[in-house]
Amino acid sequence: MKLTCMMIVAVLFLTAWTFVTADDSRNGLKNLFPKARHEMKNPEASKLNKRYGCSNAGAFCGIHPGLCCSELCLVWCT
């Protein structure tokens, strides 16, 4: 009996915690779909295509291809 009551209290607490810490989801889908549609029309607008902290062509990279934006490294980014 005590275990059942504790389980009920735990589930209620976790449910309340989920609602309290969740982002404001009002109009979430309404704002999500136009943004996704824009990225489908213009793939360059996608945030996934952007690499931050990479070196452009002509920069020294040693032998680490991950440092170059093009991921082609022969001592210098190509």
Curated annotation (Swiss-Prot):
The modification 4-hydroxyproline is found at P65. Expressed by the venom duct. It is found in: Secreted. Keywords: Cleavage on pair of basic residues, Disulfide bond, Hydroxylation, Ion channel impairing toxin, Knottin, Neurotoxin, Presynaptic neurotoxin, Secreted, Signal, Toxin, Voltage-gated sodium channel impairing toxin. Its main location: secreted. Residues 23-49 form a propeptide. Residues 1-22 form the signal peptide. GO terms for cellular component: extracellular region; host cell presynaptic membrane. InterPro entries: Conotoxin, Conotoxin_d-typ_CS. One of its GO terms (molecular function) is sodium channel inhibitor activity. Pfam families: Conotoxin. Disulfide bonds join C54-C69, C61-C73, C68-C77. Belongs to the conotoxin O1 superfamily. Delta-conotoxins bind to site 6 of voltage-gated sodium channels (Nav) and inhibit the inactivation process. The presence of a 'disulfide through disulfide knot' structurally defines this protein as a knottin. The cysteine framework is VI/VII (C-C-CC-C-C). This is Delta-conotoxin-like CVIE. The lineage of its organism: Eukaryota, Metazoa, Spiralia, Lophotrochozoa, Mollusca.
